[in-house]
């Protein structure tokens, strides 16, 4: 072999080695960025029932969780009785618990939503049946109970909103004017004439508050049957509320059949700008909404329909994602799931313009590749066109749910929910149901 041939072959071998290693590096990067590896699964609770309903990424790089607890032992140290209380847990950037506190009275008090406020504290919303201890007022069976906390969980102020029935606070926003916008269920049957008096169930009930929780306005939306809101977003000219409705009158003009996704756009004083129903002839329920970077909105829930707006039902119930315009026009829709029951409960934006979604699944086929028994928590990431980047199911042989998920400042994810399992992925159950935290990297 002459020197020239030797040099050429050496160059080819070197380039091949570099190319192969370059491809390997790219594959490794894609794996670490896209597969969503489980980092840790943790449960908190006592010998009774606990659940996490909401999680928020905090300004210090950590996160805070709101749920409820019934226990008085193990991880719960400040409860005087076994009635349900709100339960807030604050974690630092290393996933270490910084503090946890319970809030409520001697009645049934359960938290639904937590936000971090611009002053570094928190606001928490849910329902309360108490009129003692932390709760100073109650008008009936249950009221909305909104509590403002400082950065270490001390109560600054608290307010109740309700009538003589079961009124449930569900979603909470801090608005651009530093006030609050809260929505939930009005029990029309016990409202003393508020809302739609022909109603057989509940109305959407929206309340705009100032920075200290005083009511600016209060409005009701719905029809003659059951209308249940689950989430809301602020827009540049008002708010969009999403939930479900089986009404076909009063404020609802185009019900598709039984329960639909019902999306209501209102102005800054609560007047309806437009309302749209999405779904088919089966039961369709919207649970969460977020805005997109292209000026539209994505709504997540579940569907049992296979007609009209729903193009492809995969099983008994599927997670259903729709994208709508600022005017409520359907841009696209997609079902995800398998042959059993699958549902979506939350959606939030990620730093790469994608979305993290949480829910639950009973399927082991279709879009799912594992199930440990009954309902498993289901967490997955999509891009702006609903292409799946990764998905994970977490659970044991009993019932496990994920209710919320967010991305943290360090680009990892936290999903929260509840678990009654003590095997497979979950090995440390303390009672009936435990508060569940899933860390994903």
For every predicted segment, state its role:
Residues 1-9:
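Bacterial N-terminal signal peptides that target proteins for export
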Residues 8-16:
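Gram-negative bacterial Sec-dependent N-terminal signal peptides
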Residues 19-22:
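C-terminal motif of bacterial Sec signal peptides marking the signal peptidase cleavage site
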Residues 24-441:
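A sequence-level/structural motif corresponding to short, flexible coil/turn segments enriched
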């Amino acid at each position: 072999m002459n020197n020239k041939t030797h040099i050429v072959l050496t160059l080819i071998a070197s380039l091949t080695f570099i190319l192969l290693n370059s491809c390997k590096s790219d594959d490794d990067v894609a794996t670490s960025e896209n597969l969503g590896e489980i980092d840790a699964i943790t449960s908190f609770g006592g010998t009774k029932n606990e659940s996490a309903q909401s999680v928020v990424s905090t300004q210090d790089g950590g996160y805070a969780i709101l749920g409820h607890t019934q226990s008085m032992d193990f991880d719960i140290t400040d409860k005087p009785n076994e009635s349900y209380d709100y339960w807030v847990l604050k974690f630092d950037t290393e996933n270490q618990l910084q503090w946890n506190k319970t809030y409520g009275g001697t009645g049934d008090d359960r938290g639904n939503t937590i936000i971090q406020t611009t002053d570094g504290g928190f606001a928490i919303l849910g329902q309360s049946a108490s009129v003692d201890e932390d709760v100073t007022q109650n008008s009936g069976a249950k009221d909305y109970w909104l509590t403002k906390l400082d950065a270490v969980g001390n109560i600054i102020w608290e307010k109740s909103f309700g009538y003589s029935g079961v009124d449930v606070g569900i979603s909470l926003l801090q608005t651009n004017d530093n006030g609050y916008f809260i929505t939930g269920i009005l029990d029309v049957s016990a409202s003393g004439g508020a809302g739609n008096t022909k109603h057989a169930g509940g109305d959407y009930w929206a309340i705009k508050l100032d920075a200290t929780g005083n009511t600016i306005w209060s409005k009701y939306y719905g029809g003659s049957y059951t209308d249940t809101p689950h989430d809301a977003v602020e827009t540049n000219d008002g708010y969009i509320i999403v939930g479900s409705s089986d009404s076909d009158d009063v404020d609802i003009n185009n019900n598709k059949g039984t329960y639909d996704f019902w999306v209501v756009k209102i102005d800054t004083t609560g007047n309806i700008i437009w309302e749209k129903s999405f779904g088919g002839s089966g039961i369709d329920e919207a649970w969460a909404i977020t805005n997109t970077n292209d000026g539209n909105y994505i709504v997540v829930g579940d569907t049992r329909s296979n007609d009209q707006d729903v193009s492809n039902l995969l099983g008994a119930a599927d997670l259903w994602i729709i994208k709508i315009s600022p005017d409520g026009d359907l841009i696209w829709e997609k079902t995800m799931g398998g042959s059993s029951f699958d549902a979506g409960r939350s959606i939030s934006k990620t730093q790469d313009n994608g979305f993290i979604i949480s829910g639950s699944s009973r399927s082991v086929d279709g879009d799912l590749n594992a199930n440990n028994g009954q309902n498993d928590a289901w967490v997955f990431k999509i891009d702006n066109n609903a292409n799946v980047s990764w998905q994970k199911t977490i659970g044991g042989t009993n019932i496990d749910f994920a209710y919320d998920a967010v991305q943290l400042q360090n680009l990892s994810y936290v999903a929260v929910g509840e678990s009654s399992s003590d095997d497979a992925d979950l090995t440390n159950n303390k009672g009936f149901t435990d508060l569940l935290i899933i860390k994903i990297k």
